[in-house]
């Protein structure tokens, strides 16, 4: 018996991925007012290493109905930095946030001119990540990857979720990285 997500939320992670990377349905979204400066993904399981869209689709397909498929965080970046500096700063932040726990993620940097004054840039980072870590090195199929973790036999269950509570940061997780 599979407890698949309701259709309403089934593809929310995949849609989130397409939104931040401006692909598929979102390829022309905001193209006149916002620029996609950079996008990257990392820490993907082997079956999604070359195609992060496959990972985000599988998250929606196989995560339990009430399970969180992904988390999306938007962070304003300093407008004084140039594009390369924004990429470097974003990579540093994401490495601290997702890298040390080997959480799969995709991110994008968007930039647009302020609508209030029409002069200043408003660069921002979109981070989409999964709490299901690949740190244990166990290769799992997409179906198994999103099942409940089995501590006694990790190879028989899904990848462990490293929530903010599990890593000891609780609801103050974002403040830790400020």
What are these regions (language model features)?
Residues 1-178:
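N-terminal nicking endonuclease/strand-transfer module with a His-rich metal-binding environment
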């Amino acid at each position: 018996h599979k407890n698949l997500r309701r259709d309403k939320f089934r593809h929310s992670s995949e849609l989130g991925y397409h939104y931040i990377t401006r692909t598929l349905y979102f390829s022309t979204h905001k193209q006149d007012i916002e620029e996609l400066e950079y996008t990257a993904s990392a820490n993907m399981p082997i079956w999604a290493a070359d195609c992060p869209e496959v990972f985000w689709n599988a998250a929606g397909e196989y995560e339990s109905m009430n399970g969180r498929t992904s988390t999306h965080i938007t962070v304003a970046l300093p407008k004084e930095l140039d594009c390369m500096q924004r990429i470097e700063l974003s990579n540093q932040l994401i490495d601290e946030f997702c890298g040390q726990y080997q959480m799969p993620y995709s991110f994008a940097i968007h930039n647009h001119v302020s609508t209030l004054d029409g002069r200043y840039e408003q660069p921002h980072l979109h981070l989409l990540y999964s709490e299901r870590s690949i740190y244990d090195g166990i290769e799992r199929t997409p179906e198994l990857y999103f099942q409940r973790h089995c501590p006694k036999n990790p190879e028989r269950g899904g990848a462990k979720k490293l929530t903010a509570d599990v890593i000891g940061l609780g609801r103050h997780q974002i403040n830790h990285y400020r």
